[in-house]
Amino acid sequence: MRILLTNDDGINAPGLSVLEEIAKEISDDIWIAAPEEEQSGKGRAISLTHPVRVRKVGAKAWAVSGTPSDAVLLATRDLMPDMPDLVLSGVNRGQNIAEDTSFSGTIAAAMFGMQLGVPSIALSQAQNFRERGSLSWETSKAWGAKAIRPLLEMRWPKDVVMNVNFPDVEPGDVRGIQITRQGFRDEAIIHTDRREDLRGNDYYWIGYRGKLSKPDEGTDIRAIYDGYVSISPLHVDLTHEPFLKTLKESWQS
């Protein structure tokens, strides 16, 4: 099995090395194409207004001066001799659950792989109020292949991406794997921080504020809070089917 690895944290991110370890439990035909620099929060962006350059960093590995989607596109169209059988994106530094999925570069890369006809899985390591750099990567290492192998044994719809999140607990404290739906937080966690430079001009940092929600049972958030690995099937169709029917019936033509 030929596996393409990518991420949004960049070619030198520790999570990419973790992902490579996970992938080697499944195959020895591993290829890597990841952004040259961190691209967190870039969502499904592709570079249309400037050229994208690649830098070879290994026998089957490239750093791409673009977005996660750029990396997947170039790998599959130009850098690899044949299409991959599987795209793995991650392991992201921090969870990609609930509303995060809409702007996650990690999930976007997997979505792009799916769009190209390749089964794709996004993987993220939750980070609940830890100091930066102190993630429990051992949990991802221990549970990564355990989550991926059963998925590979089944056929899932071509328009579906699997979203895997590992809880912020030690490997031995993981309570198992749960199949979940996407949840929604009951509090906004994205915040802005206004500051002033030496010339008196305002500038802003955008980031996350650590807040716990009270998520419903069966959601990705609840699974992570409760110490489970969460697996959620996501798809690119954003149509709200129930309201589509209502809108059609109530629309005045």
From Swiss-Prot:
Per the entry, the cofactor note is: Binds 1 divalent metal cation per subunit.
What positions does the entry give for a divalent metal cation binding?
Answer: 8-9, 40, 92
- Listed InterPro entries: SurE, SurE-like_Pase/nucleotidase, SurE-like_sf
Instruction: Give EC number(s), comma-separated.
Output: 3.1.3.5
Q: Name one GO molecular function term.
A: metal ion binding
A cellular component term, taken from the record's GO annotations: cytoplasm
Q: What cofactors does this protein use?
A: a divalent metal cation
Is Flavoprotein included in the keywords of this UniProt record?
no
- Principal location listed in the UniProt entry: cytoplasm
The catalysed reaction is: a ribonucleoside 5'-phosphate + H2O = a ribonucleoside + phosphate
Q: Which Pfam families match?
A: SurE
Gene3D superfamilies listed in its UniProt record = Survival protein SurE-like phosphatase/nucleotidase
Superkingdom, taxonomy of origin:
Bacteria
- On whether Cytoplasm is a keyword of this UniProt record, the answer is yes
Q: Where does it reside?
A: Cytoplasm
Q: Which family does it belong to?
A: Belongs to the SurE nucleotidase family.
Function according to Swiss-Prot or TrEMBL: Nucleotidase that shows phosphatase activity on nucleoside 5'-monophosphates.
- What is this protein called in UniProt? 5'-nucleotidase SurE
